[in-house]
């Protein structure tokens, strides 16, 4: 009997004249983890949509356990043992864990939903997977990591032979990542196979047996992880060699510019006694564990969270923002962590998203000028090197990296003095990351004061001048980037736990 679970042969897919998949071949073996990498727009999502029946393939064949398949929709795929855990989890947050597990297939007894059987089945399932989850818990009260466990357990309950994990660690702490990996390894021993889609190379090398790399719709590399290295994978992804993971941080910070003194926020989660200074043209990293208060601090600086006491000043001029509109008027910009929820209008165009925060600048005699709007959009497309068809294209059609470029371009149109960036490269491929790093350093050289939140320690060490570390919503310390290391950052992040 063959140990091949999934085999994709010569898979091709076009949209009009644009060929997004070109003769893809991929083999996933039983009990193995196949890493799938590639720049945003390389074809990973299209490939998965062809597998799950969302798109109809133009050419090629897909087989599951040596049986030819062509799913009509994801539900049919799930019932056949092929499941996907999305980056943005697909759950009913106001229902219990048990309800989510059995949604659409409730066990009944004489036509009545058998809640006792559901609870017992759910408890047994979590026990078999060594997951500490209470089936009666409402999903909304659970952490992202716990919700993810529920999604994986749901896949297992369908007797899944293959589980696709899409950027599974993007919102997880280091401890939660280790828990996820232990679950993956336990399921591997039971014969379950995985496709692990990620931009995080260190994770691919840790948890995957094989790795495949897509570029421009073609399979560039597919081999055992043990037989490759980081440089080969990067070269396969971007089509060129990246000698360094990070550009040179060669900006020269100037005099003190932004000063925070004894800052305390009013509503939970409360930040307490936050004091620090950022210089003009400086890149200050903000590091801490999930829940440390990093995002909340940026929100307080941007007028989203109410400040109970303390002060914010620029060039010794005290400021008090009652809204984000006031913060923007004083030269602040905020790149949010959840770009799809808070950073863009997903149903609108690149052009609309570029100009929406600065409409008064595109008026002629009080009337919006289509010419000025188009010029602004095209200017930012060129500046950010955004890969798109035109400014009229819907932003939702772009890859994650290109969406982020549009959002950054939107703020650059306002020429901010202080740029607050919350996880600016989250869910973005290595090539696009490098471009955003270059942009951050370029902005600092132009005199902008930048605060960057990142959960990736190599990133926070690779693109900053200094690093402020948060612990339990308090400032644990500030260190010079060139004089610190990962151990110091971890020790500071646990200071007030």
Curated annotation (Swiss-Prot):
EC category: translocase
Keyword match NAD: no
Domain ABC transporter: from-to ranges: 6-241, 252-497
Top-rank taxon: Bacteria
Record keywords: ATP-binding, Cell inner membrane, Cell membrane, Membrane, Nucleotide-binding, Repeat, Sugar transport, Translocase, Transport
Intracellular or extracellular location(s): Cell inner membrane
GO annotation, cellular component aspect: plasma membrane
Entry binding sites for ATP: 38-45
Membrane topology according to the record: Peripheral membrane protein
Pfam families: ABC_tran
Reaction catalysed by this enzyme: D-galactose(out) + ATP + H2O = D-galactose(in) + ADP + phosphate + H(+); methyl beta-D-galactoside(out) + ATP + H2O = methyl beta-D-galactoside(in) + ADP + phosphate + H(+)
Gene Ontology molecular-function annotations: ATP binding; ATP hydrolysis activity
Entry annotated with the keyword Cell membrane: yes
Entry EC no(s): 7.5.2.11
Family: Belongs to the ABC transporter superfamily. Galactose/methyl galactoside importer (TC 3.A.1.2.3) family.
Quaternary assembly: The complex is composed of one ATP-binding protein (MglA), two transmembrane proteins (MglC) and a solute-binding protein (MglB).
Protein name (database record): Galactose/methyl galactoside import ATP-binding protein MglA
Species whose genome carries this gene: Treponema denticola (strain ATCC 35405 / DSM 14222 / CIP 103919 / JCM 8153 / KCTC 15104)
Gene: mglA
């Amino acid at each position: 009997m063959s140990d091949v679970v999934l085999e994709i042969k010569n898979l091709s897919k076009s949209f009009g004249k644009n060929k997004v998949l070109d003769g893809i071949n991929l083999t996933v073996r039983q009990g193995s983890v196949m890493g799938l990498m590639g720049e945003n727009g390389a074809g990973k999502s299209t490939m998965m949509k062809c597998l799950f029946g969302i798109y109809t393939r133009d050419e090629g064949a897909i087989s599951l356990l040596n049986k030819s398949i062509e799913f009509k929709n994801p539900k049919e795929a799930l019932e056949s043992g092929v499941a996907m855990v999305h980056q943005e989890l697909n759950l009913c947050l106001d229902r219990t864990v048990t309800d989510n597990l059995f949604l659409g297939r409730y066990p009944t007894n004489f036509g009545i939903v058998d809640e006792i059987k559901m609870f017992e089945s759910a408890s047994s399932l979590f026990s078999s997977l060594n997951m500490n989850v209470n089936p009666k818990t409402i999903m909304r009260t659970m952490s992202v990591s716990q919700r993810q466990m529920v999604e994986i357990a749901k896949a297992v309950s369908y007797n899944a032979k293959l589980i696709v994990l899409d950027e599974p660690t993007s919102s997880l702490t280091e401890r939660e990542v280790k828990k996820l990996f232990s679950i993956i390894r336990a399921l591997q021993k039971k014969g379950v196979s995985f496709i692990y889609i990620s931009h995080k190379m260190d994770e691919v090398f840790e948890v995957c047996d094989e790795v495949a790399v897509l570029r421009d719709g073609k399979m560039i590399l597919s081999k055992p992880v043990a037989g490759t290295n980081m440089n080969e994978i990067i070269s396969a992804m971007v089509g060129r060699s990246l000698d360094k993971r990070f550009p040179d941080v060669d900006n020269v910070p100037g005099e003190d510019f932004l000063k925070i003194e004894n800052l305390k926020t009013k509503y939970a989660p409360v930040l307490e006694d936050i004091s620090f200074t950022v210089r003009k043209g400086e890149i200050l990293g903000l590091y801490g564990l999930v829940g440390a208060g990093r995002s909340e601090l940026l929100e307080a600086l941007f007028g989203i969270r109410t400040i109970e006491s303390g002060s914010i000043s620029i060039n010794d001029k005290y400021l008090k923002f009652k809204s984000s509109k006031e913060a923007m008027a004083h030269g602040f910009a905020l790149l949010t962590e959840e770009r799809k929820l808070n950073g863009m209008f997903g149903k609108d165009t690149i052009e609309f998203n570029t100009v929406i925060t600065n409409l008064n600048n595109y008026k002629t005699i009080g009337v919006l000028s289509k010419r000025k709007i188009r010029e602004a959009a095209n200017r930012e497309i060129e500046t950010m090197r955004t890969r798109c068809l035109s400014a009229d294209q819907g932003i939702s059609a772009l890859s994650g990296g290109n969406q982020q470029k549009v959002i950054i371009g939107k703020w650059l149109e306002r020429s901010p003095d202080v740029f607050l960036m919350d996880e600016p490269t989250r869910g973005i491929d290595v090539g696009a990351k490098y471009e955003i790093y270059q942009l951050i350093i370029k902005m600092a050289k132009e005199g902008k004061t930048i605060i960057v939140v990142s959960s990736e320690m190599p990133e926070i060490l690779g693109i900053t001048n200094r690093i402020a570390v948060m612990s339990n919503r308090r400032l644990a310390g500030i260190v010079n980037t060139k004089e610190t290391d990962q151990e110091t950052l971890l020790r500071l992040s646990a200071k007030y736990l």
